[in-house]
Amino acid sequence: MANKRKIYNLADPSLDNYNLLLNEVIFHNANGYIGIRYDFEEGYPEGYEINRSQYINGFYDYTEIKHAERLYGVPDRKQTMLDVADTQEIKLFIDGEEFSMFSGKLLEFDIYLDMDRGVTVREVKWRSPLGKEIALKITRMASLHQLPLFLIEYEIDPLEFRGEIIIESAHDGNVCNFADPDDPRTADRCDQYIIPVSCEIKDGASYITSETSKSGLEVCSCVKNVLSQKNQTEFLLNNNKTTCIMRTKASSERKIKLVKYAVLCDSIRYPDCSLTAREEMNKALSVSVSELHRKHEGCLRTYWKNCYVDIDGDDELAQAVIFNMYQLNQSASKDIYGNIAPKGLSGDGYEGQYFWDSEMFIQPFFTITNPAISKTLIESRHLQLDHARENAKIMGHKCGALYPWRTITGEECSGYYPAGSAQYHINGDIAYSIIAYYLATKDIGFIAKKGAEIIFETARLWMDTGNFYR
Protein backbone atom coordinates (compact mmCIF):
# COMPACT_ATOMS: atom_id res chain seq x y z
CA MET A 1 0.00 0.00 0.00
CA ALA A 2 2.91 2.36 0.64
CA ASN A 3 3.60 2.73 -3.08
CA LYS A 4 0.22 4.44 -3.45
CA ARG A 5 1.64 7.24 -1.32
CA LYS A 6 4.22 8.06 -3.97
CA ILE A 7 3.31 10.11 -7.06
CA TYR A 8 5.74 10.24 -9.94
CA ASN A 9 6.38 12.95 -12.50
CA LEU A 10 3.22 13.76 -14.43
CA ALA A 11 4.88 16.19 -16.81
CA ASP A 12 5.71 15.64 -20.44
CA PRO A 13 9.44 14.74 -20.67
CA SER A 14 9.79 17.56 -23.20
CA LEU A 15 9.53 20.03 -20.27
CA ASP A 16 6.42 21.61 -21.73
CA ASN A 17 5.67 24.97 -20.07
CA TYR A 18 2.04 24.06 -19.31
CA ASN A 19 3.03 20.88 -17.49
CA LEU A 20 5.78 22.67 -15.59
CA LEU A 21 3.13 25.06 -14.28
CA LEU A 22 1.03 22.08 -13.18
CA ASN A 23 4.06 20.64 -11.41
CA GLU A 24 4.45 23.89 -9.46
CA VAL A 25 1.18 22.96 -7.75
CA ILE A 26 1.26 19.15 -7.70
CA PHE A 27 4.71 19.02 -6.13
CA HIS A 28 4.53 22.10 -3.90
CA ASN A 29 5.71 21.80 -0.29
CA ALA A 30 3.57 23.12 2.57
CA ASN A 31 2.73 22.48 6.20
CA GLY A 32 -0.21 24.79 6.91
CA TYR A 33 2.06 27.70 7.85
CA ILE A 34 4.41 28.07 4.87
CA GLY A 35 3.91 27.02 1.26
CA ILE A 36 6.50 26.82 -1.54
CA ARG A 37 5.56 26.21 -5.17
CA TYR A 38 7.70 23.63 -6.95
CA ASP A 39 10.18 25.25 -9.31
CA PHE A 40 13.55 24.18 -10.61
CA GLU A 41 16.10 25.73 -8.29
CA GLU A 42 18.32 26.78 -11.21
CA GLY A 43 15.50 28.58 -13.03
CA TYR A 44 14.13 28.54 -16.58
CA PRO A 45 15.07 29.96 -19.98
CA GLU A 46 13.87 33.35 -21.13
CA GLY A 47 10.24 33.29 -22.20
CA TYR A 48 8.99 30.56 -19.86
CA GLU A 49 5.92 31.53 -17.85
CA ILE A 50 6.29 30.50 -14.22
CA ASN A 51 4.85 31.50 -10.84
CA ARG A 52 7.81 31.05 -8.50
CA SER A 53 6.31 31.91 -5.12
CA GLN A 54 6.43 31.27 -1.38
CA TYR A 55 3.63 32.07 1.07
CA ILE A 56 2.72 32.32 4.74
CA ASN A 57 -0.85 31.40 5.69
CA GLY A 58 -2.75 34.52 6.72
CA PHE A 59 0.09 36.96 5.97
CA TYR A 60 -1.49 39.75 3.97
CA ASP A 61 -1.57 43.31 2.78
CA TYR A 62 -4.53 45.53 1.88
CA THR A 63 -5.27 46.15 -1.78
CA GLU A 64 -7.80 48.45 -3.39
CA ILE A 65 -11.10 47.22 -4.84
CA LYS A 66 -12.04 49.43 -7.76
CA HIS A 67 -15.68 50.36 -8.34
CA ALA A 68 -17.29 52.38 -11.10
CA GLU A 69 -19.39 53.96 -8.34
CA ARG A 70 -19.07 53.66 -4.58
CA LEU A 71 -21.97 51.89 -2.85
CA TYR A 72 -22.70 51.71 0.84
CA GLY A 73 -21.76 48.39 2.42
CA VAL A 74 -19.58 47.26 -0.48
CA PRO A 75 -15.92 47.09 0.62
CA ASP A 76 -13.35 49.31 -1.06
CA ARG A 77 -10.36 47.26 0.06
CA LYS A 78 -9.49 43.60 0.46
CA GLN A 79 -6.74 41.49 1.97
CA THR A 80 -4.34 39.62 -0.31
CA MET A 81 -1.99 36.81 0.72
CA LEU A 82 1.55 37.86 -0.17
CA ASP A 83 4.54 36.32 -1.85
CA VAL A 84 7.43 36.39 0.60
CA ALA A 85 11.19 36.19 -0.02
CA ASP A 86 12.40 33.59 -2.53
CA THR A 87 14.72 31.06 -0.85
CA GLN A 88 14.71 28.44 -3.62
CA GLU A 89 17.39 29.59 -6.05
CA ILE A 90 20.49 27.37 -6.46
CA LYS A 91 22.69 27.63 -9.55
CA LEU A 92 25.37 25.02 -10.30
CA PHE A 93 28.48 25.41 -12.48
CA ILE A 94 30.83 22.54 -13.38
CA ASP A 95 34.13 23.74 -14.79
CA GLY A 96 32.38 26.92 -15.93
CA GLU A 97 29.35 25.22 -17.55
CA GLU A 98 26.02 26.12 -15.99
CA PHE A 99 23.63 23.28 -15.26
CA SER A 100 20.23 23.67 -16.90
CA MET A 101 17.44 21.22 -17.68
CA PHE A 102 17.17 23.01 -21.03
CA SER A 103 20.77 22.69 -22.26
CA GLY A 104 23.11 19.76 -22.77
CA LYS A 105 21.38 16.38 -22.64
CA LEU A 106 19.04 14.93 -20.04
CA LEU A 107 20.05 11.29 -19.71
CA GLU A 108 17.55 10.60 -16.91
CA PHE A 109 14.91 12.77 -15.26
CA ASP A 110 12.17 12.19 -12.71
CA ILE A 111 10.21 14.12 -10.09
CA TYR A 112 8.19 12.39 -7.41
CA LEU A 113 6.22 13.14 -4.28
CA ASP A 114 6.75 10.73 -1.38
CA MET A 115 3.73 11.10 0.90
CA ASP A 116 5.20 8.80 3.57
CA ARG A 117 8.31 10.92 3.97
CA GLY A 118 6.60 14.22 3.14
CA VAL A 119 9.16 15.26 0.52
CA THR A 120 9.42 16.03 -3.18
CA VAL A 121 12.44 14.65 -5.01
CA ARG A 122 13.98 15.51 -8.38
CA GLU A 123 16.53 13.08 -9.81
CA VAL A 124 18.53 14.10 -12.86
CA LYS A 125 21.38 12.57 -14.83
CA TRP A 126 22.81 15.26 -17.11
CA ARG A 127 25.52 15.59 -19.75
CA SER A 128 26.83 19.11 -20.31
CA PRO A 129 27.31 20.58 -23.80
CA LEU A 130 31.04 19.79 -23.42
CA GLY A 131 30.42 16.21 -22.34
CA LYS A 132 30.76 16.29 -18.54
CA GLU A 133 28.27 14.11 -16.67
CA ILE A 134 26.71 14.60 -13.25
CA ALA A 135 23.80 13.13 -11.32
CA LEU A 136 21.66 15.27 -9.04
CA LYS A 137 19.21 14.35 -6.30
CA ILE A 138 17.30 17.33 -4.90
CA THR A 139 14.98 16.77 -1.93
CA ARG A 140 12.61 19.42 -0.56
CA MET A 141 10.66 19.46 2.71
CA ALA A 142 8.38 21.89 4.56
CA SER A 143 8.64 20.61 8.12
CA LEU A 144 5.49 19.56 9.94
CA HIS A 145 7.44 19.48 13.21
CA GLN A 146 9.11 22.90 12.92
CA LEU A 147 6.62 24.93 10.90
CA PRO A 148 8.82 27.90 9.85
CA LEU A 149 11.44 25.54 8.31
CA PHE A 150 11.87 24.77 4.61
CA LEU A 151 14.76 22.49 3.65
CA ILE A 152 16.49 21.77 0.34
CA GLU A 153 19.07 18.96 0.11
CA TYR A 154 21.06 19.33 -3.10
CA GLU A 155 23.25 16.26 -3.74
CA ILE A 156 25.79 16.28 -6.60
CA ASP A 157 27.35 13.06 -7.86
CA PRO A 158 30.23 13.76 -10.31
CA LEU A 159 30.20 10.93 -12.84
CA GLU A 160 33.65 10.40 -14.33
CA PHE A 161 34.32 14.06 -13.70
CA ARG A 162 37.04 15.98 -11.90
CA GLY A 163 37.11 19.74 -11.74
CA GLU A 164 35.79 22.86 -10.11
CA ILE A 165 32.26 23.05 -8.75
CA ILE A 166 30.68 26.44 -8.06
CA ILE A 167 27.34 26.67 -6.28
CA GLU A 168 25.48 29.99 -6.09
CA SER A 169 22.67 29.86 -3.54
CA ALA A 170 20.50 32.97 -3.48
CA HIS A 171 18.02 34.58 -1.08
CA ASP A 172 15.93 37.25 -2.80
CA GLY A 173 13.70 39.80 -1.08
CA ASN A 174 12.50 41.39 -4.33
CA VAL A 175 9.19 39.65 -4.90
CA CYS A 176 5.74 40.60 -6.16
CA ASN A 177 2.44 38.77 -6.37
CA PHE A 178 1.35 36.83 -9.44
CA ALA A 179 -1.37 38.58 -11.42
CA ASP A 180 -3.65 37.76 -14.34
CA PRO A 181 -6.22 40.41 -15.35
CA ASP A 182 -8.19 37.76 -17.27
CA ASP A 183 -8.55 35.37 -14.30
CA PRO A 184 -11.08 36.45 -11.64
CA ARG A 185 -9.46 34.07 -9.13
CA THR A 186 -6.22 36.06 -9.03
CA ALA A 187 -5.13 39.66 -8.57
CA ASP A 188 -5.40 41.82 -11.68
CA ARG A 189 -2.14 43.71 -11.11
CA CYS A 190 1.40 42.57 -10.34
CA ASP A 191 2.23 44.88 -7.47
CA GLN A 192 5.04 44.75 -4.94
CA TYR A 193 3.17 44.77 -1.64
CA ILE A 194 6.12 43.76 0.49
CA ILE A 195 9.14 46.06 0.79
CA PRO A 196 12.57 44.89 2.04
CA VAL A 197 13.84 47.11 4.86
CA SER A 198 17.03 45.24 5.79
CA CYS A 199 19.31 42.70 4.15
CA GLU A 200 22.37 41.44 6.03
CA ILE A 201 24.72 38.56 6.75
CA LYS A 202 25.15 37.36 10.35
CA ASP A 203 27.18 34.31 11.39
CA GLY A 204 27.17 32.92 7.86
CA ALA A 205 23.41 33.26 7.43
CA SER A 206 21.45 35.79 5.38
CA TYR A 207 18.54 37.73 6.87
CA ILE A 208 15.99 39.73 4.91
CA THR A 209 13.31 41.65 6.79
CA SER A 210 10.42 43.15 4.85
CA GLU A 211 7.36 45.23 5.67
CA THR A 212 3.97 45.33 4.02
CA SER A 213 2.99 48.57 2.35
CA LYS A 214 -0.39 49.08 4.09
CA SER A 215 -1.20 46.47 6.74
CA GLY A 216 1.74 47.25 9.02
CA LEU A 217 3.03 43.66 9.11
CA GLU A 218 6.60 42.39 8.99
CA VAL A 219 8.25 39.17 7.85
CA CYS A 220 11.80 37.92 8.29
CA SER A 221 13.41 35.15 6.26
CA CYS A 222 16.74 33.55 7.15
CA VAL A 223 18.87 31.26 4.97
CA LYS A 224 21.91 29.19 5.89
CA ASN A 225 23.91 27.06 3.43
CA VAL A 226 25.94 24.08 4.68
CA LEU A 227 28.21 22.22 2.24
CA SER A 228 29.46 18.72 2.99
CA GLN A 229 33.10 19.37 2.09
CA LYS A 230 35.75 22.03 2.33
CA ASN A 231 35.04 25.07 0.17
CA GLN A 232 35.74 28.73 -0.34
CA THR A 233 32.70 30.82 0.55
CA GLU A 234 31.87 34.42 -0.21
CA PHE A 235 28.68 36.47 0.02
CA LEU A 236 27.35 39.04 -2.41
CA LEU A 237 24.71 41.56 -1.34
CA ASN A 238 22.99 43.48 -4.08
CA ASN A 239 19.62 45.24 -4.10
CA ASN A 240 18.03 43.21 -1.28
CA LYS A 241 19.33 39.92 -2.64
CA THR A 242 22.10 37.82 -1.10
CA THR A 243 24.09 35.16 -2.92
CA CYS A 244 26.26 32.63 -1.14
CA ILE A 245 28.99 31.47 -3.57
CA MET A 246 30.72 28.19 -2.69
CA ARG A 247 33.74 26.91 -4.65
CA THR A 248 35.04 23.39 -4.24
CA LYS A 249 36.68 20.53 -6.12
CA ALA A 250 34.80 17.52 -7.40
CA SER A 251 35.92 13.99 -8.10
CA SER A 252 34.04 10.87 -9.10
CA GLU A 253 34.91 9.19 -5.78
CA ARG A 254 32.83 11.49 -3.60
CA LYS A 255 29.38 13.04 -3.66
CA ILE A 256 28.89 16.68 -2.66
CA LYS A 257 25.85 17.70 -0.66
CA LEU A 258 24.49 21.18 0.01
CA VAL A 259 21.84 21.58 2.69
CA LYS A 260 19.97 24.87 2.34
CA TYR A 261 18.04 25.79 5.48
CA ALA A 262 15.38 28.50 5.21
CA VAL A 263 13.04 29.80 7.91
CA LEU A 264 10.15 32.24 7.48
CA CYS A 265 8.58 34.09 10.41
CA ASP A 266 5.85 36.75 10.39
CA SER A 267 4.86 39.40 12.92
CA ILE A 268 1.27 38.16 13.23
CA ARG A 269 2.48 35.15 15.19
CA TYR A 270 5.89 36.37 16.40
CA PRO A 271 6.15 39.93 17.79
CA ASP A 272 9.89 40.02 17.04
CA CYS A 273 10.00 38.01 13.83
CA SER A 274 13.72 38.71 13.22
CA LEU A 275 14.67 37.31 16.62
CA THR A 276 12.37 34.33 16.12
CA ALA A 277 13.89 33.63 12.69
CA ARG A 278 17.34 33.50 14.29
CA GLU A 279 16.09 31.19 17.03
CA GLU A 280 14.33 28.91 14.56
CA MET A 281 17.47 28.70 12.41
CA ASN A 282 19.60 27.79 15.43
CA LYS A 283 17.02 25.19 16.41
CA ALA A 284 17.18 23.57 12.97
CA LEU A 285 20.99 23.62 12.93
CA SER A 286 21.24 22.09 16.40
CA VAL A 287 20.18 18.64 15.18
CA SER A 288 21.13 16.47 12.21
CA VAL A 289 19.25 16.59 8.92
CA SER A 290 18.20 12.98 9.50
CA GLU A 291 16.69 14.02 12.84
CA LEU A 292 14.74 16.82 11.13
CA HIS A 293 13.33 14.25 8.72
CA ARG A 294 12.62 11.77 11.52
CA LYS A 295 10.50 14.28 13.44
CA HIS A 296 8.73 15.43 10.27
CA GLU A 297 7.95 11.85 9.26
CA GLY A 298 6.68 11.14 12.76
CA CYS A 299 4.04 13.84 12.31
CA LEU A 300 3.02 12.23 9.02
CA ARG A 301 2.83 8.74 10.52
CA THR A 302 0.41 10.03 13.15
CA TYR A 303 -1.62 11.75 10.44
CA TRP A 304 -1.87 8.64 8.25
CA LYS A 305 -2.68 6.47 11.25
CA ASN A 306 -5.79 8.56 11.86
CA CYS A 307 -7.04 8.92 8.30
CA TYR A 308 -5.48 6.43 5.87
CA VAL A 309 -7.93 4.61 3.60
CA ASP A 310 -7.39 2.17 0.76
CA ILE A 311 -9.61 1.26 -2.16
CA ASP A 312 -9.27 -2.33 -3.36
CA GLY A 313 -9.42 -2.87 -7.09
CA ASP A 314 -8.70 0.69 -8.22
CA ASP A 315 -5.17 1.83 -7.43
CA GLU A 316 -5.52 5.07 -9.39
CA LEU A 317 -8.61 6.12 -7.45
CA ALA A 318 -6.99 5.09 -4.16
CA GLN A 319 -3.94 7.21 -4.92
CA ALA A 320 -6.13 10.18 -5.86
CA VAL A 321 -7.92 10.00 -2.49
CA ILE A 322 -4.61 9.66 -0.63
CA PHE A 323 -3.16 12.63 -2.54
CA ASN A 324 -6.16 14.76 -1.61
CA MET A 325 -5.82 13.85 2.07
CA TYR A 326 -2.13 14.73 1.91
CA GLN A 327 -2.97 18.12 0.41
CA LEU A 328 -5.54 18.82 3.13
CA ASN A 329 -2.82 18.38 5.73
CA GLN A 330 -0.48 20.65 3.77
CA SER A 331 -3.18 23.33 3.48
CA ALA A 332 -4.75 23.50 6.94
CA SER A 333 -3.44 26.11 9.35
CA LYS A 334 -2.08 24.65 12.57
CA ASP A 335 -2.76 27.87 14.52
CA ILE A 336 -5.64 30.32 14.96
CA TYR A 337 -4.09 33.01 12.74
CA GLY A 338 -4.78 31.18 9.48
CA ASN A 339 -7.44 28.95 7.94
CA ILE A 340 -7.68 27.10 4.63
CA ALA A 341 -7.78 28.94 1.31
CA PRO A 342 -9.34 27.28 -1.76
CA LYS A 343 -5.86 26.79 -3.26
CA GLY A 344 -4.31 25.94 0.09
CA LEU A 345 -0.72 27.17 0.07
CA SER A 346 -0.08 26.04 -3.50
CA GLY A 347 -0.75 29.34 -5.25
CA ASP A 348 -2.25 32.83 -5.38
CA GLY A 349 -5.71 31.68 -6.47
CA TYR A 350 -8.50 33.61 -4.74
CA GLU A 351 -5.70 35.69 -3.21
CA GLY A 352 -5.37 33.34 -0.25
CA GLN A 353 -8.78 34.30 1.17
CA TYR A 354 -11.01 31.90 3.11
CA PHE A 355 -14.52 30.89 2.03
CA TRP A 356 -17.28 28.50 3.11
CA ASP A 357 -15.22 25.66 1.60
CA SER A 358 -13.36 25.46 4.90
CA GLU A 359 -16.42 24.55 6.96
CA MET A 360 -18.45 22.53 4.44
CA PHE A 361 -15.90 20.64 2.36
CA ILE A 362 -12.71 20.45 4.41
CA GLN A 363 -13.41 20.75 8.12
CA PRO A 364 -15.69 17.66 8.31
CA PHE A 365 -12.68 15.54 7.32
CA PHE A 366 -10.60 16.95 10.16
CA THR A 367 -13.50 16.77 12.63
CA ILE A 368 -13.51 12.99 12.19
CA THR A 369 -9.80 12.27 11.69
CA ASN A 370 -7.97 15.10 13.47
CA PRO A 371 -10.34 17.13 15.66
CA ALA A 372 -7.50 19.28 17.03
CA ILE A 373 -7.16 20.91 13.59
CA SER A 374 -10.93 21.32 13.34
CA LYS A 375 -10.94 23.02 16.75
CA THR A 376 -8.19 25.40 15.60
CA LEU A 377 -10.21 26.32 12.51
CA ILE A 378 -13.22 27.15 14.68
CA GLU A 379 -10.98 29.23 16.95
CA SER A 380 -9.82 31.23 13.94
CA ARG A 381 -13.46 32.10 13.21
CA HIS A 382 -14.01 33.03 16.86
CA LEU A 383 -11.01 35.35 16.69
CA GLN A 384 -12.86 37.24 13.94
CA LEU A 385 -16.26 37.35 15.65
CA ASP A 386 -16.09 41.08 16.42
CA HIS A 387 -15.48 41.76 12.72
CA ALA A 388 -18.58 39.66 11.96
CA ARG A 389 -20.64 41.70 14.43
CA GLU A 390 -19.46 44.91 12.79
CA ASN A 391 -20.23 43.48 9.35
CA ALA A 392 -23.80 42.75 10.46
CA LYS A 393 -24.23 46.40 11.48
CA ILE A 394 -22.84 47.58 8.14
CA MET A 395 -25.45 45.42 6.40
CA GLY A 396 -28.22 47.07 8.44
CA HIS A 397 -28.86 44.49 11.17
CA LYS A 398 -29.63 45.48 14.74
CA CYS A 399 -27.99 42.44 16.30
CA GLY A 400 -26.02 39.30 15.59
CA ALA A 401 -22.95 38.55 13.52
CA LEU A 402 -22.53 38.18 9.76
CA TYR A 403 -19.34 36.47 8.66
CA PRO A 404 -17.77 37.71 5.42
CA TRP A 405 -18.06 35.61 2.29
CA ARG A 406 -14.33 35.82 1.61
CA THR A 407 -11.72 37.08 4.01
CA ILE A 408 -8.33 36.70 5.65
CA THR A 409 -8.66 38.97 8.70
CA GLY A 410 -12.44 38.95 9.15
CA GLU A 411 -13.24 41.93 6.90
CA GLU A 412 -15.24 41.30 3.73
CA CYS A 413 -13.05 41.01 0.61
CA SER A 414 -15.70 40.54 -2.06
CA GLY A 415 -16.54 43.61 -4.11
CA TYR A 416 -19.40 41.88 -5.95
CA TYR A 417 -22.47 41.91 -3.72
CA PRO A 418 -24.58 39.07 -5.26
CA ALA A 419 -21.67 36.61 -5.04
CA GLY A 420 -20.19 38.12 -1.90
CA SER A 421 -21.90 39.93 0.95
CA ALA A 422 -25.30 38.51 -0.05
CA GLN A 423 -24.08 34.96 0.59
CA TYR A 424 -25.45 34.84 4.13
CA HIS A 425 -25.27 31.05 4.22
CA ILE A 426 -21.64 31.39 5.35
CA ASN A 427 -23.18 31.87 8.82
CA GLY A 428 -24.97 28.53 8.60
CA ASP A 429 -21.83 26.83 7.33
CA ILE A 430 -19.79 28.00 10.31
CA ALA A 431 -22.52 27.07 12.81
CA TYR A 432 -22.82 23.65 11.16
CA SER A 433 -19.09 23.02 11.56
CA ILE A 434 -19.25 23.82 15.28
CA ILE A 435 -22.21 21.51 15.89
CA ALA A 436 -20.51 18.74 13.90
CA TYR A 437 -17.35 19.20 15.99
CA TYR A 438 -19.35 18.86 19.20
CA LEU A 439 -21.21 15.75 18.00
CA ALA A 440 -17.89 14.11 17.11
CA THR A 441 -15.91 15.11 20.21
CA LYS A 442 -18.42 15.99 22.97
CA ASP A 443 -16.01 18.83 23.82
CA ILE A 444 -18.58 20.79 25.82
CA GLY A 445 -15.88 22.90 27.49
CA PHE A 446 -14.76 24.37 24.16
CA ILE A 447 -18.36 24.87 23.05
CA ALA A 448 -19.16 26.73 26.27
CA LYS A 449 -16.04 28.88 25.97
CA LYS A 450 -16.09 29.78 22.26
CA GLY A 451 -18.32 27.68 20.01
CA ALA A 452 -21.67 28.60 21.54
CA GLU A 453 -20.97 32.32 21.24
CA ILE A 454 -20.61 31.98 17.46
CA ILE A 455 -23.78 29.88 17.21
CA PHE A 456 -25.82 32.36 19.27
CA GLU A 457 -24.56 35.40 17.36
CA THR A 458 -25.20 33.84 13.95
CA ALA A 459 -28.66 32.75 15.16
CA ARG A 460 -29.48 36.34 16.15
CA LEU A 461 -28.60 37.39 12.62
CA TRP A 462 -31.10 34.88 11.18
CA MET A 463 -33.83 36.13 13.50
CA ASP A 464 -33.16 39.71 12.43
CA THR A 465 -33.03 38.79 8.74
CA GLY A 466 -36.03 36.51 8.33
CA ASN A 467 -39.77 37.08 8.21
CA PHE A 468 -41.47 34.58 10.48
CA TYR A 469 -45.17 33.66 10.64
CA ARG A 470 -46.82 31.79 13.47
What are these regions (language model features)?
Residues 155, 322-329, 348-352, 356-367, ...:
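Contiguous, well-ordered alpha-helical segments that form the cores/surfaces of helical PPI scaffolds
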Residues 332-346, 372-432, 438, 445-449, ...:
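Helix-terminus loop motifs that line ligand-binding clefts
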Residues 83, 147, 317, 354-358, ...:
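Active-site-proximal structural scaffolding
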Residues 89, 98-104, 314-322, 359-404:
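Carboxylate/His-rich catalytic cores and anion/metal-binding grooves
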Residues 161, 165, 268-275, 307-311, ...:
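Inter-helical turn/loop segments and adjacent helix faces that build the functional surface
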